[in-house]
Amino acid sequence: MSDNVLLHLGEEPRFDQIKTEDIKPALQTAIAEAREQIAAIKAQTHTDWANTVEKLTDITERVGRIWSVVSHLNSVVDTPELRAVYNELMPEITIFFTEIGQDIELYNRFKIIKNSAEFDTLSPAQQTKLNHDLRDFVLSGAELPPEQQAELAQLQTEGAQLGAKFAQNIQDATDAFGIYFDDAAPLAGIPEDSIAMFAAAAQSEGKTGYKIGLQIPHYLAVIQYADNRELREQIYRAYVTRASELADEGKFDNTANVEQTLANALKTAKLLGFKNYAELSLATKMADTPEQVLNFLHDLARRAKPFAEKDFAEIKAFARESLNIEDPQSWDLSYAAEKLRQAKYAFSETEVKKYFPISKVLAGLFAQIKKLYGIELAEKTVPVWHKDVRYFELKQDGQTIGGVYMDLYAREGKRGGAWMDGYKSRRRFADGTLQLPTAYLVCNFTPPVGDKEARLSHDEIITLFHETGHGLHHLLTQVDEVGVSGINGVEWDAVELPSQFMENFVWEYDVLAQMSSHEETGAVLPKELFDKMHAAKNFQRGMFLVRQMEFALFDMEIYHQEDEGRLKEWPQILDKVRQEVAVTQPPAYNRFALSFSHIFAGGYAAGYYSYAWAEVLSADAYAAFEESDDVAETGRRFWKEVLAVGGSRSAAESFKAFRGREPSLDALLRHSGFDNAA
């Protein structure tokens, strides 16, 4: 067991030496040792910060880090063997952390510290962590009688398993699909680099011709560019019926998972004394009540809908007059929008993409980080889980302050979407030594083909900056308590502030120019082309925003239900939301909710509104840079008041410290082109 690398992870895990067969013994050994150490804490006659809170942090961090690596690998290099052990261990890890959260002896010891003279001697970050811990004990059921604790533990274990199964069904359904073409004739209109990607996908299976899958670069290439309407409809139908009863003979159908997840969430909330799961979700967020969130979303939807109606009318007219599509359907909208954008603003996304090789984009991203915060990134060779992964150290005045893994390209066996997660968090130990934070930054960009460098679309650059914003939030923390350093302890509806804030810089010409180099001439992005892009920034913005309101309202409404008998009515709730906010209705076979992993497998249950909520904060925060002539000084202030403090104080306090006032909706409305909306 001593040679099991998962028991000795260190600063950077030896990913090249991790064996699937080592996972189970490592985790079970770590959990067994942890339980012995927790028993020792409870056997002590004296209780203080060092021998209780600090010691428990040591214990949980070790187990949590092992599971973090396993969970990460399950997301990025899924294999049948890895998935089997992951699913087998999911209940064990859930039970372990549930036991801690429900341990009345530990809870009482934490209360002793809160009520002791020592509490006043703790740092503000330590006090915040202790208060969060006490809250989390209550939300884990520490105050419940034993029989209800057991019921809650069972619900939490089942909930974790349901989320994992939901995500795995989506991945399996995505990877199971493929259509093949012998020649490129049916692919007319699709950009050359995407056609090369289809050819590479076929070659990877030992086939000639072209393979189109449902990974997001494949889907977008067809739905946005393919002149072949039948192909667009075929790919659209396959994409929106993933993980449903309408695809793969129902083998990956998530319908039961959705209904069981909703029932599980409601039972959990009621056991803890809440009327519904939305109330429980908001217990750890900035927003106070579900009604406050619903009012916020309805207000934004009301403001956006007139613009969405105008957007849709413009697309319908253009499709009819210029594309000979009399009645545009869901699979026509992205295609027609791209053609309209080209006609209206005289540029295409394909043209833009030619300017952004990944090497220049990363160099430009790093230059912007240095400009804002004085931080440099330097590549370092470390063990990784896939040949495409790169690792960078963050340096301040030559000193390493953190590190980030970047896994940027789509591939089979990798979960879709983009995300940032932490491997470890900043922490100062009792002896004064400092543990540095490390993050994973994962995207699903169009991969390079052959010896050609990958090139990013402007949307992909926005995604990269977004996830980097999350990463910087985790890595630039200056808090020494692991429970509130970086993104830890930050309210979920504020966690998107740093990520959405970073997106704004991708709309500055100087930023884009320094990361551009045309694939043929090496020329930088022309100002004329940028001006066209900027003019088109809010193109179809109304349609986009009402779609986001549809997602967020659906999420909040289904988790706001108090009657278990009505939980199966979620399709009707979605229809009702669409009737209120949407300007176009999808076909009856659309099963979007069955792949809505954010709210059924990704931690955003009764929390998807966070994107819009945090966009108010991020637009207002960026406005400080628009108002300032000194970007570096404003960047240092944003670092100090928002990024550095992590979860050690409330997000509302951090925002007010940066802006000097409460957040305002004005900047978001202005950036969205809605500032003249009533």
Segments (PLM) and residue ranges:
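Active-site-proximal, well-structured secondary-structure segments within enzyme catalytic domains
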Residues: 129, 161, 168, 173-213, ...
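Short pre-active-site segment immediately N-terminal to the catalytic Zn-binding motif
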Residues: 446-465
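Short His/Asp/Glu-rich catalytic/ion-coordination signatures at enzyme active sites or charged loops
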Residues: 7-22, 70-89, 112-154, 213-256, ...
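N-terminal helix-rich structural modules
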Residues: 1-190, 625
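Short, hydrophobic/amphipathic alpha-helical patches that form generic packing surfaces
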Residues: 61-72, 135, 237, 333-341, ...
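C-terminal, non-catalytic "cap/extension" segments appended to globular domains
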Residues: 1-22, 29, 188-189, 197, ...
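Short, surface-exposed loop/turn segments at secondary-structure junctions
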Residues: 42-53, 76-80, 248-251, 280, ...
